[in-house]
Amino acid sequence: MNHYSVLNLKDGKTYTDDEIKEAYRKALLLFHPDKCKEKPSVVYTIDQVKEAYQVLSSEKDRQQYQIKQEEESSHYYSIVDLSEFEELDNGSYYYPCRCGDLGGYVVTEDDLENNRSVVPCMGCSLTIQVDYEIAESDS
């Protein structure tokens, strides 16, 4: 079940809290058995609508959900160890793609710290998964 679909929102687009709340209200009316005048082609339960709203209305939960969705839907070309990437000056890492595009694969330290390890090529549709370990700081 895709939470964006339940609330009739486009997956991956950025929404304000008010837009998510409005979509939630519309979905409640659309899928409520006593309120709906026409039966929609896809029917979700009120519990599914509430769950979708609960996840998407929380910034933290929404980010975790989006990361999980991306990782589940990504069919990556290969797994590449971070040590094979070229470290750039700005805290990013670069790895060339077989398509030859100069953009290649770029991943940042923030991406990796936030468990975003599936990286798309800047020039084609290929993706890779970055294999890495987060170093513990001695604080």
Curated annotation (Swiss-Prot):
One of its GO terms (cellular component) is nucleus. Pathway: Protein modification; peptidyl-diphthamide biosynthesis. The keyword Iron applies. GO terms for molecular function: Hsp70 protein binding; metal ion binding. Residues 76-133 form the DPH-type MB domain. It is found in: Cytoplasm; Nucleus. GO terms for biological process: protein histidyl modification to diphthamide; regulation of cytoplasmic translation. Disruption phenotype: Sensitive to methyl methanesulfonate (MMS, causes DNA breaks) and hydroxyurea (HU, ribonucleotide reductase inhibitor). InterPro entries: DnaJ_domain, DPH3/4-like, DPH_MB_dom, DPH_MB_sf, J_dom_sf. Keywords: Cytoplasm, Iron, Metal-binding, Nucleus, Zinc. Zn(2+) binds at residues 97, 99, 121, 124. It comes from the Eukaryota. SMART domains: DnaJ. Residues 2-69 form the J domain. Belongs to the DPH4 family. The DPH-type metal-binding (MB) domain can bind either zinc or iron ions. Required for the first step of diphthamide biosynthesis, the transfer of 3-amino-3-carboxypropyl from S-adenosyl-L-methionine to a histidine residue. Diphthamide is a post-translational modification of histidine which occurs in elongation factor 2. PANTHER family: DPH3 HOMOLOG-RELATED, RE24848P. This is Diphthamide biosynthesis protein 4. It comes from Schizosaccharomyces pombe (strain 972 / ATCC 24843) (Fission yeast). The lineage of its organism: Eukaryota, Fungi, Dikarya, Ascomycota, Taphrinomycotina.
